[in-house]
Each structure stands twice: as C-alpha cells, then as structure tokens.
Regions:
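C-terminal functional module detector
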Residues: 1-71, 238-319
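A metal-dependent hydrolase metal-coordination microenvironment
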Residues: 8, 42-185, 190-192, 198-200, ...
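Charge-rich, low-complexity amphipathic helices
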Residues: 125-126, 195, 284-289
Length: 319
C-alpha cells in the first residue's frame, strides 16, 4: 500500500501546482497580448504594384554636371549617427557634442544625428540643425532615415512581413518629410528581390553601414525602374571604437553644411559614397593623421580608398 503524503509534502505539492497554474496563465496572457499587438499593428492597405519598368530613353543622367567648383565644394559627411539621448533607452553612451567632436577630429564637415524615433537637437549651432530620425522599432529591423520632418511618426508594424506593409510605411512617412533613406536592406529580415522590385517612394538607399553591403538590393531596385542614390554610413553606436568610426563616409559637392544645401545635393546626386580603412587599427594618432591627410587629398585619386558611385550609368526613365 502506498504511503500517504505527509501534511507538509501535501502543502508543498499544492503550492507548486498553484505556482505552475499562475505561470502558465501569465505566459498565455503574454502570448495573447503579443499576438494582439502584432495583429493591431499589421493593418495596412493592400497594394496592387505595377509591373517593373526598366529605365529607357536616349539620354544618360549625369548628377555631376552642375557640381560647381569641384576643387573646393567637397564636404565629408556621415548621416547615420546614434548618440546618447535623455531617458533609459540608449544605443550610444556619448552625447551629441562628444560624438560630433569625435567626427570633426577625422575631418568630417557634416554630421547628422539619426537616433531611433527621436529628433535630436544640434549641440551647438542651430544653423546646422538637420531634422532626421531613424524610424522603426519592429522586430525585422525595417528601418528608414526620415529627413526634413517636423515630428516623429511612431506608427510601425511589429512584423512587416509583406511588401504592402513596407510600402504603406514609405508612403506614410513620405507625406510628412522631404525624403526617405531605406536603411541596410540586407539586414532587414524578409526583404527579398521581389520586394525591392516593388517598393518605391524612397530617394536614397544605404549601400553600406559598416556591417553589410547592399549593392545587390540596390541593383534589383534600379533594374525595376526605381531610381535612387546611395549613401555609405557608419551607423555609429560606438565612437570610442576605432573600427566603428570614420570607416564609411560620403563626399558631397555642397556649398554649405546647412540642411537646405544638403537636401539639394542629396536629391540631385552630386556626391559619392565610399569605404575607408580603419587606419592604425586602434592607434588613434595614426587614424587621425591618415584621415586628415586623406581629407586634404579627397579631390584626387587614392589607392587605399574604395569608392562606390551613388549613380549608375543608366538611361533616364521614360515618362
């Protein structure tokens, strides 16, 4: 005959059973809330995308033909820059003034602060203010830089799986801004060749953000008739790491570092994007010196830099 449980053991078993029930109910509630959040944020119009139309016509568009005095116009820039912000959610430990100062040591003329879902005020000069933020807190890392907006749009799809959802975001953000950059499509889960042949409404694609190269994605879009220029940015989170800062940049033929001139240049295409070696590999003095030398000679050829043109030689699209 089986021995009966002692009172103390019966109490422990009963307590464990109750705890298990509470844990299971809590997990079920969390799963239900997560599914509800995904469902609520998945709403978007269903798009009937037009068939891809490759560029055609007798002319080749040259974005450099009206570049002005090319001997003095070039300005080095990084547009995808994270800094410390007020609050507990931070992706960088350094404030905007510290991050800006770090870039200036390498000869950068333009630094814009693109924190997640937040407009960052320029730390010392209102004339250099550029309203830009990185949109997107979704699980698939479908991120965009939104330029020239007056406020932050917090709507997002938690799981932007379909092309219609992605296009809806581009359309929504495009109505509230001057232009949009599509960030690191290679690192965006679910972004396929089919999506790139459908999506439109962005003016710039991030071709290199330090962790990935998106030339294939850019080519898919261009081949389908979606014309855009390309930028290379550090996507900086750690200005104190030699391998993370001043390894991607863009040179703009731009009269000033003010937003109105930056916007005109980026939309007109008179710039080039490039990768830069991590000079010194941790030796900061070597890195500073090589970048200063590199900056002074930016208008001439250099064997230790790898540049990618933001404009392919493609005919203008027929209207």
């Amino acid at each position: 005959m089986e021995k009966e449980l002692r009172p103390g053991r019966r109490t422990s078993a009963s307590l464990l059973g109750k705890i298990s029930v509470v844990v299971l109910k809590t997990l079920a509630a969390l799963v239900l809330i997560a599914l509800l959040a995904v469902f609520v944020t998945s709403v978007s119009p269903i798009y009937d995308f037009a068939e891809p139309r490759p560029f055609s016509g007798p002319d080749i568009f040259n974005p450099y033909w009206d570049g002005g005095d090319s001997a003095f116009c070039w300005k080095r820039a990084n547009f995808h820059t994270h800094t410390r912000v007020k609050g507990i959610l931070n992706e960088c430990e350094h404030w905007p003034d510290e991050t800006d100062a770090a870039y200036r040591k390498f000869g950068y003329d333009i630094v814009t602060f693109s924190n997640h879902n937040e407009l960052t005020v320029h730390p010392y000069d209102p004339l250099l203010q550029v309203n830009v933020y990185e949109h997107g807190y979704n699980l698939f890392k479908y991120h965009k830089l939104v330029f020239g907006c007056s406020d932050v749009n917090l709507f997002d799809h938690l799981v932007p799986l379909f092309a219609s959802q992605k296009q809806f975001q581009l359309d929504l953000l495009g109505k509230e801004s001057d232009f949009i950059q599509m960030n690191h499509p290679l690192r965006t889960i679910g972004t396929s060749e089919d999506h790139m042949r459908k999506l439109g409404g962005y003016r710039i694609m991030e071709l290199d953000s330090g962790k990935s190269k998106e030339n294939e994605y850019w080519d898919w879009a261009l081949s389908a008739g979606h014309y855009s220029f390309g930028l290379a940015n550090d996507d900086l989170h750690f200005p104190d790491r030699s391998s993370a800062i001043a390894v991607r940049c863009n040179f703009l033929c731009c009269p000033s570092a003010r937003y109105e001139d930056i916007r005109k240049t980026l939309l007109g295409g008179c710039y080039y994007a490039m990768r830069v070696p991590d000079y010194g590999r941790g030796d900061w003095e070597v890195k500073y010196e090589r970048n200063r030398t590199f900056r002074r000679s930016s208008g001439s050829a250099s064997t230790d830099r790898q540049s990618t043109s933001p404009c392919r030689a493609r005919p203008t699209a027929s209207r």
